[in-house]
Design a protein with these regions (language model features):
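A detector for short metal-coordination/catalytic motifs
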Residues: 88-96, 100-168
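Internal, Lys/Arg-enriched amphipathic helical interaction segments that engage polyanionic partners
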Residues: 1-37
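Charged, low-complexity, helix/coiled-coil-prone segments
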Residues: 5-15, 61-70, 145, 149-150
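Compositionally biased, intrinsically disordered low-complexity regions enriched in proline and serine
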Residues: 2, 35-38, 58, 144, ...
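Short, charged surface segments at domain edges that flank catalytic/cofactor-binding sites
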Residues: 28-91, 103-113
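A sequence-composition feature that detects small, non-aromatic residues
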Residues: 14, 23-26, 64-67, 96, ...
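Generic secondary-structure transition motif, activating predominantly at the C-termini of alpha-helices
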Residues: 24, 28, 42-43, 71-72, ...
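Serine/threonine-rich low-complexity intrinsically disordered regions
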Residues: 16, 30, 86, 158-159
Length: 168
């Protein structure tokens, strides 16, 4: 796995994640729609496409919306973090983040694009996870909050493995 391919994978998958967040925040979301985890096992899907040698897996907009709705439109790092109100639906702006990055899907038999692996974050925390020097602190917190839910979906990852996906 070359450095260039790793860099390309990060860039291409980041673009997919940005497009997902743009799509979910541009649409009107019904706040009253409550989502419950179902623990149905979902096998890894075929890749959406291969671009520039990078395998890209589809992100399901509805699953991201469900995850954000389940958090009651709050940041899962700190529910007191404030966000602006969206024009589209009057709800707080939140971003969906796959705790185990979709770029790692090839390592897992079951889909990573499930609500149990998608966390709701304010822009500040989402950017800190991707670019902050203390991102490992935030990732560790989310890991401990989500590990049991992930296991129910047969998604097994150690904290050390997860941190390595983020470059720690």
């Amino acid at each position: 796995y070359s450095k260039k391919l790793k860099k390309d994978s990060k860039r291409v998958n980041a673009k997919e994640d940005d497009e997902l967040n743009e799509a979910i925040n541009a649409n009107k979301i019904q706040k009253n729609k409550y989502f419950n985890y179902c623990h149905e096992l979902i096998l890894r899907q075929e890749p959406k496409e291969i671009r520039q040698g990078v395998t890209v897996y589809k992100r399901d907009k509805q699953k991201a919306i469900n995850a954000i709705s389940h958090s009651n439109f709050q940041c899962e790092i700190n529910p007191d973090h404030l966000s602006f109100v969206k024009k589209s639906d009057g709800l707080p702006y939140m971003e969906a983040h796959h705790l185990i990055p979709m770029a790692q899907q090839d390592l897992f038999e079951y889909s990573l694009d499930v609500e149990e692996n998608i966390v709701s974050l304010c822009s500040q925390c989402h950017n800190e996870i991707h670019y902050g020097e203390n991102a490992d602190r935030l990732i560790t917190k989310l890991y401990h909050e989500r590990i049991e839910l992930l296991k129910k979906k047969k998604i097994y990852v150690s904290l050390e493995e997860l941190l390595s996906y983020y470059g720690f």
